[in-house]
Amino acid sequence: MEVAMTDLFTYIKDKNIAIDLNSKWFQELWYPLSKKTGSIITTRLLEWMGYSGEYKLQRQNFKRLLDNNNIPYEEIYHNDDRFLEHPSMIYEIEQTDKKQIKQKRWITLEMRNFKKAILRLNTKNAEVIRDYYLNLEEACFDYAEYQVNWLRKKSDLERSINEDKLNQSMLLLAIKDEELESEKEKGIQTRSMLKKVEEEKIKIENEKEKALRKMLRLKEITITQKERTITQLIYISTSVSYAAQHRFKVGGVEGRRRLRGRLSDYNGRSASGDEWYFCHLIDVADFRKAEGRIEDIIGKFRDKKDKEIYIMPYRKLLKVIELICQNYTIEVSTLNAMLKDIVDEFEDDAVPLIPDAIPQSTFKITRVEFGKNVDTTIIQGKATKAQLIKEFEKYIQTLSVDENEINRKELFDDLSRLYNFNRNDAWVWLKEFIESQEEKTFILKYR
């Protein structure tokens, strides 16, 4: 095993990944990826992306790309608190004339939106730029996986060392036990020595159990710390004649490199002059899961003969697909953000939280004991006032506009199937609840 974990830059060099670590814009790409912060579009980045001319013209052309593709961005001044320590902003301030610094503005994008801009570049060297950025992103993912494997090996080694130490302790304890037996035979061993040895044995067993729990927990943590990546794609494709009929194919692939093959398959079956093309691409974590969600929501709009085709006006289809995929991505991103907190709680020695049961009425459990069925009656704790008030709210929502009578006995009989409660207390709470209703007047009937 390595003495220390290899840093990212050494890792990239050793793996011969096609990334120039000495380029003047490498740090401007790497810093936002590593810190998960916004990207500042500097003069160096604009030149790297293929924009020429003065800064004002470069910035204007890049903004046009963002606006045309509905990519969110923000314009900031040099004294924005969020970017005072950002290396790119520090460099830009140093390179800008002090007389112009107060008027100059910079475009900033979130990491995901910067990637979308890279993927939609239309400059002369756009394809080279995309390959470079994707290589850098893949290198980061590969390095994260390397870190997980390194930590797992370290955990296994520490566990092996700890097991050796525990085995040595147990061996010494066994020797002490033999010596104790010998002393007992000679009649010179005292009760205090016996008690001390027994306490030491219990202590060692507890330490062994605690160490084992900790090692298993650590091993599990190094496996679960890896975040889910969002590198797969959902696409919408069509042809001119199909689009004129509101007919679109919605599918997915594992990565951008698989798109060309899909298009070749579709055009192999299309009529000459009416070739298929992609009209929209969306990044997702798992395209198959995303396809399943799309089918579940708008499956009724699929062509009965060709299940792969959805029949829907493009603007509406695009809005629905974007909504489904964005919500899926938000769920994955939220879980990624929670991973550290989840892992930290696993590593804590705090007592786990055991949730309270919802108070319900009595119920029976039948067990087989000595070949016979034995019924056991279990009574749950009483429902709280807040729980019953919530059920009262649900009940009045089921009444029609013209209904205003509430039958106490019928309502309480229904609730007793779910909860265990005192009917006298519930009657008082029900009257309080009805009196608090301002939108509608209800009549309470005892029976």
Swiss-Prot record:
Domain of life of the organism in this record? Viruses
InterPro entries in alphabetical order: MSV199_dom (IPR018879), Phage_T5_Orf172_DNA-bd (IPR018306)
| Ranges in a coiled coil | 188-221
Record keywords: Coiled coil
Q: Which Pfam families match?
A: MSV199, T5orf172
Question: Under what name is this protein listed?
Answer: Putative MSV199 domain-containing protein 420R
